């Protein structure tokens, strides 16, 4: 792919000119703020840059590039913004490099050499003779209509029969004749362009040579490639139409031409051949092929002869592109359509990738669900096997279990301790201190329940707050003496200590102290001598427990304090 500059009226492309003379730089698509600045500078309507869009280095100032070695490629600064766009137009207008300009210039030189083949009058003119051109042209304007057969009457006759006109012209009129020849050559060059544009406009988009507007609209399959190849022709032809290679005529030549026009329209048809006839009503080059001409004045007969001659000779494709102003606009519009189609194609590809990604995720989820279903199926099969294996023991188990699964009713004896029932979890973690131990924290889970008997069942299970490893364990029963508030707390611990504590319950507070303590023979020292516990339900509905103890080496000291939050009733 050949890299081309995306700026309007810029035909720089890769491989054109000297190496490293022009460098190309991509649009900053990832930097939105800088991209907006670039787009404002380029000033292209209905156009979106892609990763294949470039700007050449001629649109940037010298301070926009980073300092590098001479043999290294140019590198734009992160803040560089294009700002030079009018200089490129001046460059083309001054000396340019378009193929159409070379062709027109070559044609002018050919006509000049043909006009001055028999005599060297134009080459031997001095500066003093050139100064005489203006007064001589005025004399030519005041000449009588009887001399219409002379070269001054029909400029076409000058280009067709230069030898005869030079013989009939006196020597003192050499300078006006030379200037008239140059004017005829310029008018002939303009007439060629006007002839091509008028033939394209009169044919309504299709002339007798077989070239129509349909030639510029290829089938949809290769539209983008065709539009990309015609993009350079569009800009070059547009530049040629805006700035023709023929220099402007001086004011005196224009006056001479306007004076000659009414004379040549009436008498010079028979004397001038149709191949060299000139038109006096030029048509605007920017007119579209389908639009009607704005000038409705009748055309001279010379122009009619010229149109017949132009229809008889087929034109080349380059002349059609240069003359048909609507074709270039069509190419520009198709070029923007091409880029929009590419952009839509990239968006479709992106959407396809996202859909494929989502389909892959959905497939993995389905596989996980199928694996989970298979695991559930296996568990159900194992459960059925266990049920079948336990069938012989069902009559025996049914005799042990109660006939109904309803929870038992609370015994009225333990009603004063009903506020302790439920499952409790520590919140926050409990704190443990003792003079012979390092301070520590722990988590604890408490279950206090009943089975309808005049007692409560309890279990205390503590865990490490970080590793959640089991620590202290104890379980037992809480009994009340009927018709009193005396309470007995019987506990067995995993440290090998069994104790019986007794106390009283007052409202929602229970205080007990050790009555007897027993331990295994290999229990660790120092041995616990006395323990006190205090349970209290605070105003927030949380259960608090405080434990104090005395050993053989330490007096009664607070050992544990923890607060529980009720999880289940």
Curated annotation (Swiss-Prot):
User: One MF term in GO for this entry?
Assistant: DNA binding
Show the segment(s) annotated as Nitrobindin: 407-569
Annotated transmembrane regions: none
Q: Which GO terms describe its cellular component?
A: cytosol; nucleoplasm
Q: Provide the protein's localization.
A: Cytoplasm; Nucleus
Q: Where are the zinc fingers (THAP-type)?
A: 1-85
* Coiled-coil portions: none
Q: Which CDD domains match?
A: lipocalin_heme-bd-THAP4-like
Q: Quote the EC number.
A: 5.99.-.-
Q: Map out region (Disordered) in residue numbers.
A: 83-219, 235-312
Q: Which UniProt keywords apply?
A: Cytoplasm, DNA-binding, Heme, Iron, Isomerase, Metal-binding, Nucleus, Phosphoprotein, Zinc, Zinc-finger
Q: Which reaction does it catalyse?
A: peroxynitrite = nitrate
> Where can the motif HCFC1-binding motif (HBM) be found?
230-233
Q: Which InterPro entries match?
A: Calycin (IPR012674), Nitrobindin (IPR045165), THAP4-like_heme-bd (IPR014878), THAP_Znf (IPR006612), THAP_Znf_sf (IPR038441)
What GO terms describe the biological role, i.e. biological process, of this protein? nitrate metabolic process; tyrosine metabolic process
Q: Which SUPFAM superfamilies match?
A: Glucocorticoid receptor-like (DNA-binding domain) (SSF57716), Lipocalins (SSF50814)
Cofactor (UniProt): heme b
Q: Where is the composition biased (Low complexity)?
A: 196-210, 280-289
Q: What is known of its domains?
A: The C-terminal nitrobindin region coordinates a heme and bears the isomerase activity. The N-terminal zinc finger domain likely binds DNA and may be involved in transcriptional regulation.
Kindly provide the name given to this protein in its UniProt entry: Peroxynitrite isomerase THAP4
The gene name on file is Thap4
């Amino acid at each position: 792919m050949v890299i081309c500059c995306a700026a309007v009226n810029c035909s720089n492309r890769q491989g054109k000119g000297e190496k490293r003379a022009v460098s190309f730089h991509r649009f900053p698509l990832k930097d939105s703020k800088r991209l907006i600045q670039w787009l404002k500078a380029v000033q292209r309507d209905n156009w979106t840059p892609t990763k294949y869009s470039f700007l050449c280095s001629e649109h940037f100032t010298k301070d926009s590039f980073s300092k590098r070695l001479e043999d290294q490629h140019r590198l734009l600064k992160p803040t560089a913004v294009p700002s030079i766009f009018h200089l490129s137009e001046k460059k083309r207008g001054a000396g340019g490099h378009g193929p159409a300009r070379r062709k027109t210039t070559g044609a002018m030189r050919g006509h000049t050499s043909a006009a001055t083949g028999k005599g060297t009058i134009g080459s031997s003119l001095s500066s003093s003779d050139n100064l005489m051109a203006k007064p001589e042209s005025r004399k030519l304007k005041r000449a009588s209509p009887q001399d219409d057969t002379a070269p001054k009457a029909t400029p076409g006759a000058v280009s067709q029969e230069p030898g005869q006109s030079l013989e009939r012209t006196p020597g003192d009129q050499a300078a006006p004749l030379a200037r008239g020849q140059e004017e005829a050559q310029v008018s002939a060059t303009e007439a060629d362009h006007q002839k091509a544009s008028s033939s394209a406009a009169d044919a309504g988009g299709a002339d007798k040579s077989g070239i129509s507007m349909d030639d510029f609209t290829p089938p949809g399959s290769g539209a983008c490639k065709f539009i990309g190849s015609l993009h350079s022709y569009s800009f070059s032809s547009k530049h040629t139409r805006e700035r023709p290679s023929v220099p402007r005529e001086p004011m005196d030549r224009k006056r001479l031409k306007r004076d000659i026009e009414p004379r040549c329209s009436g008498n010079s048809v028979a004397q001038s051949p149709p191949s060299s006839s000139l038109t006096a009503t030029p048509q605007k080059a920017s007119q579209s092929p389908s639009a009607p001409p704005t000038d409705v004045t009748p055309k001279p007969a010379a122009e009619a002869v010229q149109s017949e001659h132009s229809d008889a000779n087929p034109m080349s494709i380059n002349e059609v592109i240069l003359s048909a102003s609507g074709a270039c606009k069509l190419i520009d519009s198709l070029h923007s359509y091409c880029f929009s189609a590419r952009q839509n194609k990239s968006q479709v590809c992106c959407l396809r990738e996202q859909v494929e990604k989502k389909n892959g995720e959905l497939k993995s989820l389905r596989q996980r669900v199928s694996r989970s279903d298979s695991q559930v199926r296996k568990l159900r099969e194992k459960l059925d096997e266990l049920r079948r294996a336990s069938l012989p023991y069902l009559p025996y188990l049914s005799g042990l279990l109660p006939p109904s699964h309803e929870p038992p009713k609370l015994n009225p004896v333990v009603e004063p301790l009903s506020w302790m029932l439920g499952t409790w979890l520590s919140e926050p973690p409990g704190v443990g201190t003792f003079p012979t131990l390092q301070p520590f924290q722990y988590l604890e889970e408490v279950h206090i329940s009943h089975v309808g008997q005049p007692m409560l069942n309890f279990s205390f299970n503590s865990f490490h707050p970080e590793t959640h490893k089991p620590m202290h364990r104890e379980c037992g029963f809480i009994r009340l003496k009927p018709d009193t508030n005396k309470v007995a707390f019987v506990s067995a611990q995993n440290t090998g200590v069994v104790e019986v504590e007794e106390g009283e319950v007052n409202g929602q507070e229970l205080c007990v102290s050790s009555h007897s303590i027993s331990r295994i023979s290999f229990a660790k020292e120092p041995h616990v001598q006395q323990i006190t516990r205090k349970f209290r339900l605070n105003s927030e509905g949380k259960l608090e427990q405080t434990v104090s103890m005395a050993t053989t080496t330490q007096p009664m000291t607070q050992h544990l304090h923890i607060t529980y939050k009720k999880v289940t009733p």
